[in-house]
Design a protein with these regions (language model features):
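Short, aromatic/basic amphipathic alpha-helical patches
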Residues: 56-64
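A conserved acidic beta->alpha catalytic loop
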Residues: 47-57, 104-107
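Short alpha-helix within the catalytic core of nucleotide-sugar-dependent glycosyltransferases
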Residues: 27-28, 55, 97, 111-115
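Short, acidic, metal-binding catalytic loop of nucleotide-sugar glycosyltransferases
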Residues: 28-40
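Short beta-strand/loop segment that forms part of the nucleotide-sugar
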Residues: 39-49, 74-77
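A conserved hydrophobic helix/loop-capping motif in glycosyltransferases and polysaccharide synthases
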Residues: 10-22, 26, 33, 46
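Glycine-rich, basic loop-to-helix element that forms the pyrophosphate-binding segment
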Residues: 78-95
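Short aromatic/hydrophobic "clamp" motif used to bind/position activated sugar donors
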Residues: 100
């Protein structure tokens, strides 16, 4: 059992644009692998105007995770051209936890956030 009072909290920050084919594989697995730690883990997914159905897929499949705060989903069309630093900084601003970890859409965290 993890003592959550002393454990730093972690935010996995994912930035995405038109990578539904990748996030469909990784996000459900990452959420499941870390579900028992959701008091200290959050996932932040920032969608920069995807046109491949990502927004609908998230809405259809992750209502519970979004309501609970385990998954934060943010959609914006403000970034016309992809810029990795802007994307990551946007996700970091939305994250609430002590440790911020950048994930690409095709990255897996492993069980327990890799701890």
């Amino acid at each position: 059992m993890i003592d959550n009072s002393q454990t730093p909290k972690i935010s996995f920050c994912i930035t995405c644009k038109n990578r539904l084919y990748q996030i469909k594989k990784t996000l459900p697995q990452n959420l499941e692998d870390n579900r028992r730690l959701q008091e200290i883990v959050e996932f932040v997914l920032v969608d920069f105007g995807s046109t491949d159905g990502l927004r609908k897929w998230i809405s259809d499949n992750f209502k519970h995770e979004i309501r609970s705060g385990y998954l934060k989903y943010f959609y914006t069309e403000e970034m016309v051209y992809w810029h990795a630093s802007i994307a990551k900084n946007t996700a970091h601003m939305l994250a609430q936890n002590d440790i911020l970890v950048n994930l690409d859409c095709d990255n897996y965290t492993g069980s327990n956030g890799g701890w």
